[in-house]
Regions:
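Terminal low-complexity tails and localization/encapsulation signals of metabolic enzymes
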Residues: 143-154
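Hydrophobic alpha-helical segments typical of transmembrane helices
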Residues: 42-45, 54, 66, 103-106, ...
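CoA-thioester-processing core
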Residues: 6-59, 73, 88-92
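A short, small-residue-rich loop immediately preceding and capping a beta-strand
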Residues: 1-4
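Acidic, divalent-metal-coordinating active-site segment for phosphoryl/phosphodiester hydrolysis
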Residues: 62-69
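C-terminal long alpha-helix characteristic of the crotonase
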Residues: 20-25, 67, 76-124, 130, ...
Length: 154
């Protein structure tokens, strides 16, 4: 997130798994000042990320918060200088890419399940955990661990 992420821009950012903001970023959901409410999951994602009280404050005041405030309340995962934004994102992506794509996919399903009404996140986790066994990634990961080397997931 670089610069302003207001309304739909913040709603789009909140739909991402991980958010990184430059220190010049300003974020907010000003829709109530226009006579509507945040849409596209904005109210739901915001409250899941920052908690009910902070979400209500942000929506009701239609104000903006700084990158530092967004980091403190959990709206963004990390902050950095504007000139370091791309490099910071690339470093995070590189760390993710070193891991098992199959396991990451299963982890996303399990984590997201905990936020869906009527879905038992623990059951989804148990199912996804079980699916990981016997995969090529599991074999590579455990073999690499036993051989004291880094796994090579391709």
């Amino acid at each position: 997130i670089n610069g302003f992420a207001l309304g739909g821009g913040l709603e789009l950012a909140m739909s991402c798994h991980i958010r990184v903001a430059s220190l010049n970023a300003k974020m907010g959901l000003p829709e109530v000042s226009l006579g509507v409410i945040p849409g596209y999951g904005g109210t739901q994602r915001l409250s899941n990320l920052v908690g009910k009280g902070k979400a209500m404050e942000m929506v009701f005041t239609a104000g903006m918060i700084t990158a530092e405030e967004a980091f403190q309340c959990g709206l963004v995962n990390s902050i950095c200088e504007q000139e370091d934004l791309i490099l910071t994102c690339e470093k995070i992506a590189s760390k993710i890419c070193r891991n098992s794509k199959t396991s990451i996919s299963s982890a996303i399903k399990a984590i997201n399940a905990g936020f869906i009404d009527g879905v038992d996140g623990f059951e989804v986790e148990k199912k996804e955990f079980g699916k990981c066994f016997g995969t090529e990634d599991f074999i590579e990961g455990t073999t690499a661990f036993l051989e004291k080397r880094k796994a090579n997931f391709n």
